[in-house]
Regions:
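Active-site helix of classical SDR
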Residues: 118, 154
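Substrate-binding pocket helix/loop in short-chain dehydrogenase/reductase
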Residues: 94-95, 102-107
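Conserved glycine-rich cofactor-binding loop
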Residues: 12-13
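Alpha-helical segment proximal to the catalytic Tyr-Lys
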Residues: 123, 166-171
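Residue(s) in the substrate-gating loop at a strand-loop-helix junction
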Residues: 138
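Conserved glycine-rich Rossmann-like NAD(P)H-binding loop of the short-chain dehydrogenase/reductase
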Residues: 26-43
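C-terminal helical subdomain
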Residues: 170-173, 177-178, 185, 195-228
């Protein structure tokens, strides 16, 4: 991954920090769009603030804002090699009790952000003849679980997006998805203090799978949906 240029959306979150650390350690340059400055400081406290890490304010659910962000990356490096669509959100609720505004929020955070991300980088990747896109779905959608239907539907759509887009992209560009089970994060520990965490997966373990899919070695893997 030495010399590769990566965009990691959601890079200030728990999984995003692990992915960013993994990529920086492998020699990549990482660009992260953010909206909360304090989260950037937390990221830098973990991975450092070296010359290979770039953070710029951009809302990835706003196509115009993300387009400007991508152009900044292209202006600096001339290419975007890797996109990790790591932005997402969770909310519980069944079909009847989930308000439409919450449906919209789940679709915006989990699906719209990924669509905008892919649309933003694909022209440059296609022109270069190289690209790695990794989307984040969830094991909760295979098979779909009830009780948090807005989240489930949005993450299931990520699988369809991944598989369909893998058939649309040019040679040299791959599109894959990882499906984490419950991740061991501070937020999940707080939300489920009495849960059995023996089956939870670490964010570093998920980042290792993402790292492989983003690597040059994974060029023949596309359209895969990998549970972790």
């Amino acid at each position: 991954m030495t010399g590769r240029v990566a965009i990691v959306t959601g890079g200030t979150g728990a999984l995003g920090q692990s992915v960013t650390s993994r990529f920086l350690s492998a020699g990549a340059t990482v660009w992260i769009p953010y909206v909360v400055p304090a989260e950037v400081e937390a990221l830098k406290a973990r991975v450092g603030a070296g010359a290979s890490l770039h953070c710029a304010h951009a809302d990835v659910t706003d196509e115009t804002a993300f387009g400007r962000f991508v152009q900044s990356v292209l202006d600096a490096h001339g290419r975007v090699d890797i996109l990790i669509n790591g932005v997402g959100g969770f909310a519980g609720g069944d079909l009847v009790s989930t308000r439409l505004v919450e449906w919209d929020r789940m679709l915006t955070l989990n699906l719209r952000s990924a669509v905008i991300g892919c649309r933003g980088v694909l022209p440059a990747m296609t022109a270069a003849g190289f690209g790695r896109i990794v989307n984040i779905s969830s094991r909760a959608v295979v098979p779909p679980l009830g009780g948090f239907i807005g989240y489930t539907v949005a993450k299931a759509a990520i699988i369809t997006l991944t598989q369909a887009l893998a058939r649309e992209v040019a040679r040299g560009v791959s599109v894959n998805a990882v499906l984490p089970s419950t991740m061991d994060t501070p937020a999940n520990r707080q939300a489920m203090p009495d849960a059995d965490r023996s089956g939870w997966v670490s964010t570093d373990a998920v980042a290792e799978v993402i790292g492989y899919l983003a690597s040059d070695a994974a060029g023949m893997v596309s359209g895969a949906t990998i549970p972790v």
